[in-house]
């Protein structure tokens, strides 16, 4: 049995929550969530390989203890091979897929270690596939700057700690290494920007991770902002949902009018932006994650790609009018994960 090792830096909740859901549990026998630090703490390829085999052994025991989840014979073979390789890895890692998620949350040192781990995996004598290879995958600043340079986005992004200043206003501030959204109100001019940056500096929060982002207004004629979400899992791209809000910084849906819910349902069934999304994921060299974006007159505005996204929504939201959307998306996610192995 091939496994999917899902590496995270900060929050293991998104993938674990999905695997505990009624639909996501179909993939639980194959997916092994674990923290980067489990590998980073090991010295050299042999010790790293042994750590991977240790988790393969744990997963095999768990699957054998739940005989109705997967065929017994496959898990017994995985257990036997894992125990053997644990004592003598000999250049082998467990066969399967290694997903480097949470890349945007890694420190500079963490990125360096992730690149080293990726190189070790690439030299494995086993059949190993790497998603979000940290030696290739673009992080937020590089992605947004590339999308602007390519004419896909109409807004640019800047690093104030490197002396970069915006060419147009309004702008807002955000951190590059999290998904909490804006850390400022809309800033209308250079004087307001200088004041906002000075406040951050005085609080000790003006770091190299702070970005200046030009504001792009995507509200419709009714003042409603629609934030689309779509997943990439290996070679598959599929919609997640649309969040509607009157707030320009849209994190979750605040509006549930019937016509908006119908628009969301149509979106997840038809995936109208499929070709463009595939192009953007390929451009960023991102194999696993969720893109957040809006549409204006047929043109896309990409806000970010989260490499450790929420998959299963809160239990209270899984009922009512949006339940068909969540069920469909989770079924597609489970199918996409199975297709990896």
Task: Please identify what each model-predicted range represents.
Residues 190-269, 274:
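Phosphate-binding site of ATP-dependent enzymes
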Residues 171, 211, 238, 289, ...:
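Protein kinase-like catalytic core scaffold
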Residues 1-5:
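Extreme N-terminal starter segment of soluble prokaryotic enzymes
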Residues 21, 37-168:
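Conserved N-proximal alpha/beta basic substrate-recognition cap immediately N-terminal to
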Residues 286, 295-341:
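C-terminal active-site "lid" helix and adjoining low-complexity regulatory extension at the edge
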Residues 229, 290-292:
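Short, surface-exposed charged micro-motifs
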Residues 11-20:
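Short N-terminal binding/cap micro-motifs at the start of the first secondary-structure element
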Residues 165-183, 205-222:
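ATP-grasp fold ATP-binding core
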């Amino acid at each position: 049995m091939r496994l999917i090792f899902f590496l995270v830096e900060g929050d293991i909740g998104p993938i674990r929550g999905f695997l505990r859901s009624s639909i996501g549990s179909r993939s639980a026998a194959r997916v092994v969530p674990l923290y980067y630090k489990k590998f980073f703490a090991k010295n050299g390829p042999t010790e790293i390989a042994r750590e991977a085999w240790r988790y393969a052994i744990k997963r095999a025991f768990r699957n054998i203890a739940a005989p109705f989840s997967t065929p017994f014979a496959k898990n017994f073979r995985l257990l036997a091979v894992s125990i053997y390789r644990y004592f003598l890895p000999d250049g082998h890692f467990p066969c399967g897929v290694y997903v480097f998620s949470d890349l945007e949350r890694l420190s500079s040192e963490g990125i360096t270690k992730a690149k080293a781990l990726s190189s070790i995996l690439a030299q494995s004598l086993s059949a190993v596939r790497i998603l979000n290879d940290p030696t290739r995958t673009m992080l937020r600043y590089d992605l947004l700057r590339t999308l602007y340079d390519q004419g896909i986005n109409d807004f640019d992004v800047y690093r104030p700690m490197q002396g970069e200043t915006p060419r147009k206003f309004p702008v807002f501030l955000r951190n590059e290494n999290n998904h909490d959204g804006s850390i400022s109100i809309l800033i209308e001019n250079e004087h307001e920007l200088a004041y906002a940056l000075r406040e951050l500096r005085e609080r000790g929060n003006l770091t190299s991770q702070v970005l200046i982002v030009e504001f792009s207004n995507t509200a419709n004629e009714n003042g409603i902002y629609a934030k689309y979400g779509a997943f990439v899992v290996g070679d598959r791209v599929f919609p997640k949902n649309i969040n509607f809000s009157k707030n320009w910084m849209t994190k979750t849906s605040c509006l549930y009018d019937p016509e908006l819910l119908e628009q969301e349902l149509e979106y997840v069934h038809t995936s109208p932006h499929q070709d463009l999304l595939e192009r953007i994921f390929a451009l960023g060299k991102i194999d696993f994650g969720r893109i957040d974006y809006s549409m204006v007159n047929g043109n896309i505005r990409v806000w970010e790609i989260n490499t450790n996204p929420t998959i299963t929504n809160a239990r209270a939201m899984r009922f009512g009018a949006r339940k068909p959307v969540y069920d469909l998306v989770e079924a597609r996610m489970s199918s996409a994960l199975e297709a990896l192995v």
